[in-house]
UniProtKB/Swiss-Prot annotation:
It holds the Pfam family GATase. This is Imidazole glycerol phosphate synthase subunit HisH. Keywords: Amino-acid biosynthesis, Cytoplasm, Glutamine amidotransferase, Histidine biosynthesis, Hydrolase, Lyase. PROSITE patterns: GATASE_TYPE_1. GO terms for molecular function: glutaminase activity; imidazoleglycerol-phosphate synthase activity; lyase activity. It comes from the Archaea. One of its GO terms (cellular component) is cytoplasm. Its EC number is 4.3.2.10, 3.5.1.2. GO terms for biological process: L-histidine biosynthetic process. Disulfide bonds: none annotated. It is found in: Cytoplasm.
Length: 190
């Protein structure tokens, strides 16, 4: 399976490419919509600033709506309606607003337990690696699949159809993260 990793040109996507390869995919870097049209699935990685990433990601909205998509950290945040960071608009795939997190330490860095609240073929409960200063507050929403508890609850994963977003970094989450990527690939092949 060929998986296109969107390159926002503002961060390192090497660990995502390596994790996809370890999970059995053939990862390729995509910088344009035309290139993305030739892949089987898409990854919106979690690197860069919201403003810079959104400028490129909005070109990929139709691709995200059509192809299996895994959005990681910043990639997941781009799927929401808006963000406090950079005062930016989001892609509006999911309802919600990205805000600066309330936690004892910001950014939230490290392994945190992720609580799953609805059945998912892809998201499993357990410890994942987080690195973020912004997030979406937990609330009632059928797409919200998992949460992380800091000073408040924040969305850890969203899911609707073929679109999956995770606030954590599966590519840095050891075996647990690799298994999540494998499950994403298995579902994407259907």
């Amino acid at each position: 399976m060929i998986v296109g990793v969107v390159d926002y040109t503002v961060g390192n996507i090497g660990s995502v490419l390596t994790a996809l390869k370890r999970a059995g995919a053939v990862p390729v870097v995509v910088k344009g919509v035309e290139e993305a049209g030739r892949v089987d699935a898409v990854v919106l990685p979690g690197v860069g600033t919201y403003e810079a990433a959104y400028a490129l990601a909005r070109q990929f909205k139709e691709v995200v709506l059509e192809k299996p998509t895994l959005a990681i950290c910043l990639g997941m945040q781009l799927l929401f309606e808006s963000s406090e960071e950079g005062g930016g608009q989001g892609l509006g795939v999911f309802k919600g607003r990205v805000e600066r997190i309330k936690a004892r330490k910001v950014p939230n860095i490290g392994w945190r337990y992720t609580h799953v609240v609805k059945n998912s073929e892809i998201i499993a409960e357990g410890y994942y690696y987080y690195l973020h200063s912004y997030g979406v507050r937990w609330g009632e929403n059928e797409a919200y699949t998992a949460y992380i508890k800091l000073e408040e609850k924040y969305v850890a994963a969203v899911e609707r159809g073929h679109i999956i977003g995770v606030q954590f970094h599966p590519e840095r989450s050891g075996r647990t993260g690799l298994e999540l990527i494998k499950r994403f690939l298995a579902v994407a092949k259907r």
